Regions:
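Conserved N-terminal diphosphate/IPP-binding helix and adjacent helical/loop segment
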Residues: 1-87, 91, 95-110, 158-166, ...
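All-alpha helical catalytic cores of prenyl diphosphate-utilizing isoprenoid enzymes
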Residues: 34-37, 52-54, 119, 133-229
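Hydrophobic faces of stable alpha-helices that mediate helix-helix packing
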Residues: 26, 30, 85, 92, ...
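Divalent-cation-assisted or electrostatically stabilized phosphate/pyrophosphate-binding catalytic cores
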Residues: 102-124, 165-180, 206-207, 229-255, ...
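Acidic/serine-rich, low-complexity amphipathic helices located in mid- to C-terminal regulatory regions
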Residues: 123-131
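Alpha-helical phosphate/pyrophosphate-handling elements in metalloenzyme active cores
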Residues: 40-84, 124, 169-212, 248, ...
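Short acidic/histidine-centered micro-motifs embedded in hydrophobic/aromatic stretches
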Residues: 49-50, 81, 98, 143-150, ...
Length: 328
């Protein structure tokens, strides 16, 4: 069973500027993902469809780049594991959200139903830790176990805060650190350690990854309100319809307190478009974009990158810049 896919931005830009080692390692990651998916038995077809749906492969890219050319099998294995965890979490998110589409493609939830999609997510999580256990990779097993718990905690915070326009920026950041930043952070740490990073540099790489992840989430939330469906793969204002309160909404309420009385439970496709326009009119989207850009700049100035090989650092900065370019 194959999983052909086009290589997305910002990965293409990095590949064009990298040496021969990086495309080869990414190909090994794709082969590893396909091998795991093919081993899922009756769920293999559903898993292959999820894999073919693609994505940016930013997390595996971060693993490989933080490891550098000497990361070897440990880096490839970590990259596969990180992407499998990401895939599993998305499948479960789609079940919780009752999402018909992801990246413009029907979800497993939509095509196969709640039970099968839930089981696929469970199988992806389990397969990740089976692979790591067989390799005796205790470090990756431990870190990704903690990360999986963080993902669940972040998802729970999102559910508990649904439709609550009283959420603060601090509430939002805490949720996103768990739900998004934790896996980016783990990717950078596992990659760095595969490449020989010591404790101090690993800590710096954790902060770098977390910063990239938070910026990624901020810009994704901006795009939900501003981006056309053909670009986002979902209807505009989907987060609002789901009751998910994001930083652009929080900043908009700070700028226009009259928005705080909106009843998100009463939104439909027409009224959500009007509300999205009202939020944009406050200037909140530009403010959140600026906050995300500042996060990217801070991440790129991390001391953990300063001690790297210049070419390795340049490629990591390309990935960071790619987060911004995708939303420009």
């Amino acid at each position: 069973m194959t999983s052909e896919r086009s290589i997305p931005e910002p990965v293409t830009a990095v590949l064009e500027g990298a040496g021969a080692w990086l495309p080869g390692e990414l190909a090994r990651v794709e082969a590893g993902l396909t091998e795991i998916i093919d081993g899922l038995g009756p769920l293999a077809a559903d898993g292959a469809a999820t894999l073919r749906a693609g994505g940016k492969r930013m997390r595996p890219m971060l693993v490989l780049l933080c490891a550098g050319p000497g990361g070897g099998e440990a880096a490839v294995r970590a990259a596969v594991a990180v992407e499998l965890i990401h895939m599993a979490s998305l499948v479960h998110d789609d079940v919780l959200d009752r999402a018909p589409l992801r990246r413009g493609i029907p979800t497993t939830y939509a095509t196969a139903g709640r039970e099968r999609a839930t089981t696929l997510g469970d199988a992806l999580f389990s397969s990740t830790f089976t692979m790591l256990a067989r390799a005796g990779d205790l470090r990756a097993t431990e870190l990704l176990s903690f990360t999986a718990v963080d993902l669940a905690r972040g998802e729970l915070l999102q559910r508990e805060g649904a439709y609550d326009l009283g959420l603060t920026a601090g509430d939002y950041e805490n949720r996103c650190r768990l739900k998004t930043g934790s896996l980016f952070s783990a990717a950078c740490v596992l990659g760095g350690e595969a490449g020989g990073a010591g404790p101090e540099q690993s800590e710096g790489l954790a902060d770098f990854g977390r910063g990239i992840g938070l910026a990624f989430q901020l810009l994704d939330d901006v795009l939900d309100l501003a981006g056309p469906p053909e670009r986002t793969g979902k209807a505009r204002g989907t987060d609002l319809l789901d009751g998910t309160v994001t930083l652009p909404v929080i900043r908009a309420i700070e700028l226009d307190p009259s928005l705080a009385v909106v009843d998100l439970n009463q939104l439909d496709e027409e009224s959500v478009a009007e509300l999205s326009d009202r939020i944009a009119a406050t200037g909140a989207l530009d403010q959140v974009r600026a906050e995300a850009l500042a996060m990217i700049d801070r991440a790129k100035s991390s001391p953990a990158l300063e001690s790297m090989d210049p070419e390795q650092r340049r490629l990591l900065e390309l990935v960071a810049d790619g987060v911004v370019q995708r939303y420009s």
